[in-house]
Amino acid sequence: MLMLMLAAVATVVRAQTVCRFRTVRTGKVFANPVTLEGDLLFYAFSNTVVVKNVCKTDIAVYLGQRVFITKNRFEASILPLTIPKSMEVKMPSITSAHFVSDAMILFVIDGKVYSYNFIEDIWRTVNGITEPVSHISGDPCCFEGYFCLELSNNLFAYFRGGQMPGTNIYFSNNGGFSFELLNSDRMSHLKGLLGGIFHFHSLSQVGILLVENNLGTFHYLEYPLNHSTGVPFLYESPLEVIIKPQQRGFLILWNQKTLLVSSNSGQIVEAMQLMEEGNINDLNVEHAKLTIHSIASNTYELAFLVEQDQLYYGSQSYMGNYIIKLSNQQFWSEEASVHFWDVGMLEVLTPVSDPYFPAFDFKKCLVNVQLALMDQSLQLEPCNVEFLESTMEDRMFIIDMNSKLKLSALMVPRKGMNPTPLVMVSNPHALGFKANLTQFGNMYDGNSKFKLDIELQQQQHWGNSELNFTASIKHEAISSITVDIADKTLSCVDLKPLSTLISVGCDLTKKVIVQNKISACAMGILDPVLLQKNYSYTIEKEAYNPTSYSGEAQDDLIVFYQYKELGCPRLVYYDKPWKPVVELWKDGTLEEIMNAEYVILELNGIVTYSYSLTAATAHCRSQPQNWSIFKEDAEKPSLWNRETYVSCHEDNQDNPLLWPNVEYQILGGRTDNKIIFGQRNGIYTFYLTVVDPYYSYCDLNTIFSVYVYGALPVAEFRPMTSILLMVTVTLFTMWLAYAIPKQLRTERGRRLTGFCFQIFKYCPGICTCAWLRGKMRRGLRSRRVKDQPEKIPQIGKKPDIKK
């Protein structure tokens, strides 16, 4: 009997005690004369909270009656945080904190935003905010790459409780180094008290929480949700809004008397489901006479400590939000706080002051949630899944336009159980999928193995959703994908859902290359060795227009050939219409020969080429764009791109087809437009950019060179004119060769010859050269003598009558 009583007591003790306290105390062997300088910071509210750096979980800040920043999970004694007197803070109370990097945190102190580099111990006032604010919101992304960094840099600063419209909202796209005033035109129709503004990256939306008549409602600014709102919910007093990490769309809205959650970025806000004694009911914190003192969360878990010395633990998923009372162990104090260091590892943290040292120690109690939930008194069913794994964890995937992505997961259910796997996306407006579950073998114990195959692509390409449901295909989007078990029990703590982030946007491994199968070097026209030695060539002033100013060129242009970027030029015959063959490469592999619409521009201003099609022959229905529209920004050819391109093959009342004979300067796509080079040999350097908005989200562009050959020098006269002139001159010359000798034998010819002789004799000024004049005289004399008859008497002498 005694043994049974001892066993019962032991069971009760185990149910109540879920962890053991330990105290962290370091660096206090010898007396430390350190004194605190500046103003001691404190949290403006009566509760406590631990804000973690979600990308580097060893870093966190504790907010309470004192403020502490740790870089090692509070595993050392820490001095309370102070702000220098030079910052001139009237009331050093913190209302919001947000980590922006591994070394910097933003604080809202007394209505102003300050940045603190806790590695260098440098404080700075953030520029751009001119009116008091109370909160900073952001959603950090922890994957590597520029895309994720851009998400993390987007922040809002706002005053909670301000009247809309009329309250200034500030935004930052540089990680909080500076802020700008947000344009309020898009929010002019919103009315109520501002409860917060947030970047919901998992839904590709900006959400605004407005409160009116004790009802809170989320409004969205981006299509297709900009004309709809979330479901209203009861909002009687200000609520703190926590965006849970990893862009899953999970929210927590809470204060000391309220706890609400959302699994879809605020579209539906609901209460947690309390599991107690086998029953499940909505948790009403106020009716349960509880006062939440501190709350903790990670991606799929949450926990909170109440002033009534009770610790609650719950899970948050797309299928349900359940919570259970974990322990009645005495945790609570005014300084106590809770936070997660890992999945299923919950820590109760309490700063402890030291009368002899300024640094605070920390009393810690680490709760193994999985072990605590195994207590039979909680009456929880065991986890119905033994194994759930996939390679998609801890990776971010990219789906470009017209691309697909295939993922898979492996599931092993608990023996005798038949769980249902569930695939969910956070942004169904942009991302769609289909999934297939197949059995593919057994474990050693005879348990079945299942494989889940998932195929994802843009929602627009599935063709099974309404037009007003899908997001704009021209704009990039983000969504998470999660694989979970639909009927998973609360005890599956260690079996977290499989989830990752999908970027419906530009795949940075893509690039375009102009095919170069026949080059000028391969044909022996150019020498690649010479091209690499600062090779230069001349562009005649008649062949180019300056790119730096408008007007005609005044001098020839000398261009140095960039062999490293251009390689050997492609060889093109001048008299043959030509179109570049553009290849699309992805991650070093040739994907396809591109057939999208693109444009080219000669970078040195050469204008001796044209296009084979006009607006009419290209079957345009509106006036086509051309480079003259962007001529004011000739130094920025990238301004004509997929975002600024407007197709002429669609009706456009604002730009009707008025000039059908203008050049159609777009290559590729539905037309067979080609380049026609003028009668000029030489090198052309082109910039090529893809303008088709439905081909890729990337700004695909490249530069390439061609060498045009085979052009003869340009004739100064028209060919027909030259031929007529040549024939006329030939015939006239032949007539003169016949007519002149004949005329010289006549009396008129002799008189003409004598007349010419007299002119050359008495007009020496006609030829100033004596030698040449003598030659001409002798020539004329010999010609005259030769042409005369043999018996003509000599001039100036009488004839010999005797003979």
From Swiss-Prot:
Signal peptide limits: 1-15
Intrachain disulfide bonds: 19-365, 55-142, 141-148, 383-492, 506-698, 521-568, 620-648
GO biological process, one term: flagellated sperm motility
Glycosylation: residue positions: 226, 418, 436, 468, 534, 545, 626
Keyword Cell membrane part of the UniProt annotation: yes
Broad class of where this protein is predominantly found: membrane
InterPro entries: CATSPERD/E, CATSPERD/E_C, CATSPERD_b-prop, Ig-like_CATSPERD
Domain of life: Eukaryota
KW Nucleotide-binding (keyword) present: no
Keyword vocabulary terms for this entry: Cell membrane, Cell projection, Cilium, Developmental protein, Differentiation, Disulfide bond, Flagellum, Glycoprotein, Membrane, Signal, Spermatogenesis, Transmembrane, Transmembrane helix
Residue spans crossing the bilayer: 721-742
Residue ranges annotated as Cytoplasmic topological domain: 743-803
Membrane topology: Single-pass type I membrane protein
One CC-aspect GO term: CatSper complex
Compartments reported by the entry: Cell projection, Cilium, Flagellum membrane
Regions of this protein lying in the Extracellular compartment: 16-720
Region (Disordered): 782-803
Family listed: Belongs to the CATSPERD family.
Subunit description: Component of the CatSper complex or CatSpermasome composed of the core pore-forming members CATSPER1, CATSPER2, CATSPER3 and CATSPER4 as well as auxiliary members CATSPERB, CATSPERG, CATSPERD, CATSPERE, CATSPERZ, C2CD6/CATSPERT, SLCO6C1, TMEM249, TMEM262 and EFCAB9. HSPA1 may be an additional auxiliary complex member. The core complex members CATSPER1, CATSPER2, CATSPER3 and CATSPER4 form a heterotetrameric channel.
Function in brief: Auxiliary component of the CatSper complex, a complex involved in sperm cell hyperactivation. Sperm cell hyperactivation is needed for sperm motility which is essential late in the preparation of sperm for fertilization. Required for CATSPER1 stability before intraflagellar transport and/or incorporation of the CatSper complex channel into the flagellar membrane.
Protein name: Cation channel sperm-associated auxiliary subunit delta
Gene from which the chain derives: Catsperd
